[in-house]
């Protein structure tokens, strides 16, 4: 949940910075078409910047260490498991990292299917059986194979575009109204302070509301990743892994952008703002075979 939240906050920060630069430099769009083009460039730009930086940010945020050569039997097993599953789904071998954390957790990130990263916590390796850990790894490999990183980036780009467009359109109307240009015929954006204040507040508010859409897609992809894991290692192993997660506690380590975690418990947000479905729903979906068809 933290990783997705930070990805959204990064996009929001990029939009706010772009908006600040435009307002300070006096660059404003005088037409709806121009505003839409600007919103698209900045909206998708923020999302793709986050995607391109995702591996670096992920490793930096959790203090992960990429395994170059296995130093013990656990690291050897982890590399071989990732290699075998990658071959099964037809993707290049991802980088594999381990990070120090007591929580049972793992994530996948990266800009491309064939240039990805899979990281697991020491808590996962210490507290899960090999079968359960294998299922979690298969879940992350399924995220990569399904192209979920790029899918979520495109969705975020569309959401960003509409947030910027609607916010600045309303801000331009409000600024023009207060400056006496109630017909919107002037090329001037109106009162620049009003324009800046309204656009920044609306981008923040609409960005938070738009995260509901992004979170819905994220939850949808989690069901498919669970199903992908079940196909790779067996349904019972994935169910066992999720049941083990029910006994774990909420992960607290710092997050990273565009990462897909296995641990989806949440105690502080309603389901609308959850990046993962409740664990009971994920287990039920696996038992019913809803996403295995």
UniProtKB/Swiss-Prot annotation:
The chain crosses the membrane at residues 4-24, 34-54, 158-178, 193-213. Its EC number is 3.4.24.-. Binds 1 zinc ion per subunit. One of its GO terms (molecular function) is metalloendopeptidase activity. Belongs to the peptidase M48B family. NCBIfam families: PRK05457.1. This is Protease HtpX. It comes from Yersinia pestis (strain Pestoides F).
């Amino acid at each position: 949940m933290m990783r997705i939240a930070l990805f959204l906050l990064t996009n929001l920060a990029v939009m706010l910075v772009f908006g600040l630069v435009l307002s300070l430099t006096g660059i404003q769009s005088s037409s709806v078409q121009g505003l839409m083009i600007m919103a698209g460039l900045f909206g998708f730009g923020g999302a793709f910047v986050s995607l391109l930086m995702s591996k670096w940010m992920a490793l930096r945020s959790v203090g992960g260490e990429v395994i170059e050569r296995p130093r013990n039997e656990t690291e050897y097993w982890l590399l071989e498991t990732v290699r075998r599953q990658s071959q099964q789904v037809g993707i290049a071998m991802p980088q594999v990292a381990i990070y120090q954390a007591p929580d049972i957790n793992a994530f996948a990130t990266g800009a491309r299917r064939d240039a990805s990263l899979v990281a697991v916590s020491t808590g996962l390796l210490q507290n899960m059986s090999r079968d359960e850990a294998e299922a979690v790894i298969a879940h992350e490999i399924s995220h990569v194979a399904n192209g979920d990183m790029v899918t979520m980036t495109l969705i975020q780009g569309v959401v960003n575009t509409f947030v910027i467009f609607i916010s600045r359109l309303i801000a331009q109307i409000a600024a023009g109204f207060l400056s006496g240009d109630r017909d919107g015929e002037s090329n001037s954006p109106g009162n620049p302070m009003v324009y800046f204040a309204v656009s920044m507040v609306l981008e923040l508010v609409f960005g938070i509301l738009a995260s509901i859409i992004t979170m819905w897609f994220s939850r949808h992809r989690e069901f498919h990743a669970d199903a992908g894991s079940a196909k790779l290692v067996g349904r019972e192993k994935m169910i066992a892994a999720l049941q083990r997660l029910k006994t774990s506690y909420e992960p607290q380590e710092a997050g990273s952008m565009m990462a897909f975690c296995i641990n989806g418990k949440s105690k502080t947000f309603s389901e609308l703002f959850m990046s993962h479905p409740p664990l009971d729903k994920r287990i039920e979906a696996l038992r019913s075979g809803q996403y295995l068809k």
